[in-house]
């Protein structure tokens, strides 16, 4: 399960390029209209399937006993910044586009962290109690009472680009884990001394 693509978009865009070469404007307009309808339906279908899969995934996690309490994302962001980014200057944050992607603090090596499979192992092995979780490109954030039941695999599923950058961190700021939308960046794990 995870984020799915139902259509070969490369072939779709090649078809669009072919339409531009047509000498018959009426036929070109008809094909463009049909392609737009196909595109809209496929996007709607993918969104439906991905939302369903996400809901199923959340139910599976909650069935294991995890308790997610919705909180203000602003609260989670303030805590993240205080715990993990307080050493970064405003200039550094601008340079690395920190406000758009908090994980850039790790990828630009402004804050040392484990990465890749090493980060996943470290996250799975660390002692977890209460934690905060937020998603970069949405307004979603939660307080998790029993994060010890959560694994890197639980956080490693893409259901959409908007939900791809996931951050979870200890409620006392002892550790942090960031899963990114970039397949060659991260995930990252930071444990404070």
What are these regions (language model features)?
Residues 1-193:
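Structured alpha/beta or helical-core interaction and ligand-binding surfaces enriched in interleaved
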């Amino acid at each position: 399960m995870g984020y799915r693509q139902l259509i070969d978009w490369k072939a779709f865009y090649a078809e669009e390029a072919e339409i531009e070469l047509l000498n018959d404007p009426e036929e070109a307009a008809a094909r463009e209209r049909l392609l737009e309808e196909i595109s809209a339906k496929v996007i709607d279908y993918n969104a439906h399937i991905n939302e369903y899969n996400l809901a199923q995934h959340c139910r599976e996690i909650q069935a294991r006993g995890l308790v997610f309490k919705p909180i203000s994302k602003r609260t989670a962001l303030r805590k993240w910044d205080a715990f993990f980014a307080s050493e970064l200057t405003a200039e550094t944050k601008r340079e690395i586009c920190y406000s758009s992607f908090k994980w850039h603090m790790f990828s630009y090596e402004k804050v040392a962290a484990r990465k890749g499979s090493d980060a996943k192992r470290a996250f799975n092995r660390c002692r977890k109690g209460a934690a905060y979780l937020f998603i970069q490109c949405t307004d979603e954030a939660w307080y998790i009472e029993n994060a010890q039941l959560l694994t890197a695999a639980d956080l490693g599923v893409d259901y959409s680009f908007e939900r791809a950058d996931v951050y979870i961190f200890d409620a006392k700021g002892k550790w942090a884990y960031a899963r990114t939308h970039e397949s060659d960046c991260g995930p990252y794990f930071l444990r404070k001394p």
